[in-house]
Each structure stands twice: as structure tokens, then as C-alpha cells.
Amino acid sequence: MSLRFVISGTDTGIGKTVFAAALTHALEAHYWKPVQSGLEEETDSQTVARLAGASHARILPEAYRLKTPASPHLSARLDNVSIDPARLLPPRPDGPLVIEGAGGLLVPLTDRLLFADIFALWQIPLILCARTALGTINHTLLSLEALRHRAIPVQGVVFIGDEDRENERVITDIGAVRRLGRLPRLPELTPEALHQAFAQHFNLADFLEVPA
């Protein structure tokens, strides 16, 4: 079976789309964003295509494209759309697949369904993106508890931001989770700079073996 990963985060706006682009490039993977909320600016799929240098064929169409940049349950309500979980089954392309959620794990898709509930059904190894800054210990450990409560397989944690060895140590030790690497903030976010940063700060072998 081809490699498949879910990319989620401890919060919104932490850089998980940028990391998803880096991983998509490194694995020469397909990319899928199940639900896109907000269409006026560059979408996550467009960002990944640009930063990963991925062809149109490797960027799989979203199941839902919602106009309002908000939590999917609200965006869908404003668009008069009903999100059907049956439409959120992961595609099976020929080759690796990177799937990106929205916001954090407990972001609602509907009034009764969270992203974490869908991830639990999928049973695809999840990579948790976390900040390095103040507050990340609590946010990340809570996210890991939510994952384990639902028996979602965890590939590891990716830190994003300036180096903070103590925060990273505490999270990996107390959270009993693998540190996959840290993506630093890039002065200029170009495809070349991103690919170089991934090569310098991550070991691709960590993404070629998945939890049993």
C-alpha cells in the first residue's frame, strides 16, 4: 500500500500547509484537502501546488469548496451546503498521498462531527504540526491526548518556528511521541528555500515507515 499521511495542527495558522507542501514535494506525493473554507485568496491546494512544484494531476480536487474563511461547519451553513461524511473518503491515487485537515483536530465539520472523528475512521497515520513558542506544550499535549483517545495512529510531531529545545523536549518526553523535525521560519518563502529547509531539518526515512 502506498504511503498516506494526514497533516493536522494544534491550531490554525501555524504553518501546516507549508509543511504539507514540503512533504508533498519530498515524497513526490499527491495532495488532497477534503474541505476548503475560503476561496477569495490563494487556497491551500494552490499554495501546495506552487510551493511543492506539483503538477495539476497531483493536486486532487477538494470534496467541498466553501466560500467563507471560517470553521467548515459554519462555512457550509452560510453556503447552504450539507457536508456528507460519505464524500470524505480519502482518494487512492497511484503513489503517496498527503491529506491536510483544517485548523486543529477538534474543528467541527458539522454540528455533530469533528475532523478528529473522520481521522479516527480513516486510521491513516497523522503528523501533528506544533508551534515552538510559548503555550505550545499545553496545546500539543492536549492534541496528543485527543488523538490517543480516538486511537488515531500518530507518525510524530513536526515543530514549526524558531528553535526552543526545552519546549520540544518536554513535548516529546511527556507526550511519548517522536520528534520528526523542525521547520524554521523562512525569510523568503520560495519553493527552493522550502525544499532546502526540509532536506536540512528532516530525515526522509522517518516518513517512509509508518506505525504498526
Curated annotation (Swiss-Prot):
Highest taxon above the source species: Bacteria
Ligand binding (ATP): 13-18, 100-103, 184-186
Keywords, alphabetical: ATP-binding, Biotin biosynthesis, Cytoplasm, Ligase, Magnesium, Metal-binding, Nucleotide-binding
Bilayer-spanning residue ranges: none
Catalytic activity: (7R,8S)-7,8-diammoniononanoate + CO2 + ATP = (4R,5S)-dethiobiotin + ADP + phosphate + 3 H(+)
Pfam families in alphabetical order: AAA_26
Recorded GO MF terms: ATP binding; dethiobiotin synthase activity; magnesium ion binding
One GO term of the biological process aspect: biotin biosynthetic process
Compartment list: Cytoplasm
Active site positions: 33
Chain positions recorded as Mg(2+) binding sites: 17, 100
Listed GO CC annotations: cytosol
The keyword Cytoplasm is annotated on this UniProt entry: yes
Primary residence: cytoplasm
Stretches assigned to coiled coil: none
Residues at which substrate binds: 37
Pathway entry: Cofactor biosynthesis; biotin biosynthesis; biotin from 7,8-diaminononanoate: step 1/2
The protein's Enzyme Commission number: 6.3.3.3
Subunit structure: Homodimer.
Family matches, as PANTHER family: ATP-DEPENDENT DETHIOBIOTIN SYNTHETASE BIOD 2 (PTHR43210:SF2), DETHIOBIOTIN SYNTHETASE (PTHR43210)
Function in brief: Catalyzes a mechanistically unusual reaction, the ATP-dependent insertion of CO2 between the N7 and N8 nitrogen atoms of 7,8-diaminopelargonic acid (DAPA, also called 7,8-diammoniononanoate) to form a ureido ring.
UniProt family annotation: Belongs to the dethiobiotin synthetase family.
HAMAP family hit by this protein: BioD (MF_00336)
Protein's UniProt name: ATP-dependent dethiobiotin synthetase BioD
Gene: bioD
